[in-house]
């Protein structure tokens, strides 16, 4: 006997009920993005591994631990995308879109990371992604944050989230701060977790968001980045706060919130929740002016973006998404099937969602109808066929009607 085949660990099938909720979330988010001038685009799920190595750095957790990369049949190293931003900036460069700036892109689709599966964290998951390329100044950061708030409001979860905000300052601010941070952490080198000792050499700012309890106690007394802002960085953050206040965006400044990659600057943010346990981040992003140059552009390119996990959003609340009011046509006998097919086809051409249940005992067919959560059922027997009528039953009210096709269509169009 063959083994029962299962999906790979950490990868789940999206069944119709799941897809219904995913589609609802995507459509709501897309509609809000359109109001802000975002246009949908997509990049390949598979990219050259160097696209992500170059953008994220080989020492990052994603590249060193989580990326799905392998050699293809041409002996090229390729990878399933672990995030959207790198592929979108690669597309911006390879399609020579510089002359079309500014650009606002919305993307959605599957993301892959070899992570430890748990509730709210899978190895294949889906994201909403927004990138604003050519976004200059603190005002565009504030607008991006307001977009994120409006998306969460449209999805009816904004009230259960907190916007945590920080500024990473300019490169000069970070350089001075990183030196002071390393000096402080070196005194605790032997007490740090093994992972943080590695980060101390390769990416010390990442220690600030360590989940290790001992690391957290050490970090609690570490220098704070804002103490080393240049005048430019300080003014930028003050402008951002001013614009957010004007827009009515509520926030909590978190001086320990960082982005561990060199191309990030100024604004960094996360929307967190208490409803999902350890997987508390729903949406996160930041400004990444240095990424385009790292990936081959001639100069830095001002840009800001964020991503949100669809599966995590779906866990935040119960989405009772109703489909189109489904109509089921049930021919009573075999000699009624041809007429029933004509009716089904005519209803579909009028944009009425319709299925046909042509065979089997009436009781079993009725049970299948109920399982489909249909709104209406149309019975077609010899009498209805002879008189060119339809027997329509409203399954919610239990009301029945004998109508011709035109009257039936008129009634169905109301739902």
UniProtKB/Swiss-Prot annotation:
This is Histidine--tRNA ligase. It comes from the Bacteria. The gene is hisS. One of its GO terms (molecular function) is ATP binding. InterPro entries: aa-tRNA-synth_II, aa-tRNA-synth_II/BPL/LPL, Anticodon-bd, Anticodon-bd_dom_sf, His-tRNA-ligase, HisRS-like_core, HisRS/HisZ, HisRS_anticodon. HAMAP family: His_tRNA_synth. Gene3D superfamilies: Anticodon-binding domain, Bira Bifunctional Protein, Domain 2. Keywords: Aminoacyl-tRNA synthetase, ATP-binding, Cytoplasm, Ligase, Nucleotide-binding, Protein biosynthesis. GO terms for cellular component: cytoplasm. GO terms for biological process: histidyl-tRNA aminoacylation. It catalyses: tRNA(His) + L-histidine + ATP = L-histidyl-tRNA(His) + AMP + diphosphate + H(+). It comes from Rickettsia canadensis (strain McKiel). It is found in: Cytoplasm. PANTHER family: HISTIDINE--TRNA LIGASE, MITOCHONDRIAL-RELATED, HISTIDYL-TRNA SYNTHETASE.
């Amino acid at each position: 006997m063959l083994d029962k085949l299962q999906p790979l660990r950490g990868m789940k099938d999206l069944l119709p009920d799941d897809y219904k909720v995913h589609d609802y979330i995507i459509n709501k988010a897309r509609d809000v993005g359109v109001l802000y001038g975002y246009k949908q685009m997509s990049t390949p799920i598979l990219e050259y591994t160097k696209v992500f190595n170059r953008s994220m750095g080989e020492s990052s957790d994603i590249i060193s631990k989580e990326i799905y990369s392998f050699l293809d049949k041409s002996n090229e190293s390729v990878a399933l995308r672990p995030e959207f931003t790198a592929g979108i900036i690669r597309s911006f460069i390879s399609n020579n879109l510089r002359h079309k700036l500014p650009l606002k892109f919305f993307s959605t689709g599957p993301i892959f990371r070899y992570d430890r599966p748990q509730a709210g964290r899978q190895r294949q998951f889906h994201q909403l992604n927004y990138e604003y390329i050519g976004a200059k100044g603190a005002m565009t950061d504030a607008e991006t944050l307001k977009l994120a708030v409006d998306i969460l409001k449209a999805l009816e979860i904004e009230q259960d989230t907190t916007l945590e905000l920080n500024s990473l300052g300019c490169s000069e601010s970070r350089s001075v701060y990183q030196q002071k941070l390393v000096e402080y952490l070196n005194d605790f080198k032997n007490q740090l977790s093994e992972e943080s000792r590695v980060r101390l050499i390769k990416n010390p700012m990442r220690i600030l968001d360590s989940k290790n309890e001992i690391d957290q106690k050490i970090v609690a007394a570490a220098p704070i980045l804002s103490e080393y802002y240049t005048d430019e960085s300080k003014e930028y953050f003050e402008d951002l706060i001013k614009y957010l206040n004007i827009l009515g965006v509520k926030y909590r400044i978190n001086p320990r919130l960082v982005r561990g990659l060199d191309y990030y600057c100024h604004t960094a943010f996360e929307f967190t929740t208490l409803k999902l346990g350890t997987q508390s981040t729903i949406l996160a992003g930041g400004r990444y002016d240095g990424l385009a140059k790292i990936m081959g552009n001639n100069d830095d390119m001002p840009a800001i973006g964020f991503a949100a996990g669809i599966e995590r959003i779906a866990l935040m609340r119960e989405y009772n998404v109703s489909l189109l009011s489904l109509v089921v046509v049930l021919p009573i006998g075999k000699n009624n099937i041809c007429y029933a097919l004509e009716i089904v086809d005519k209803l579909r051409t009028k944009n009425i969602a319709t299925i046909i249940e042509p065979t089997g005992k009436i009781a079993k067919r009725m049970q299948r109808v109920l399982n489909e959560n249909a709104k209406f059922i149309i019975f077609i027997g010899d009498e209805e066929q002879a008189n060119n009528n339809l027997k329509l039953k409203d399954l919610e009210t239990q009301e029945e009607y004998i109508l011709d096709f035109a009257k039936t269509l008129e009634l169905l169009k109301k739902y």
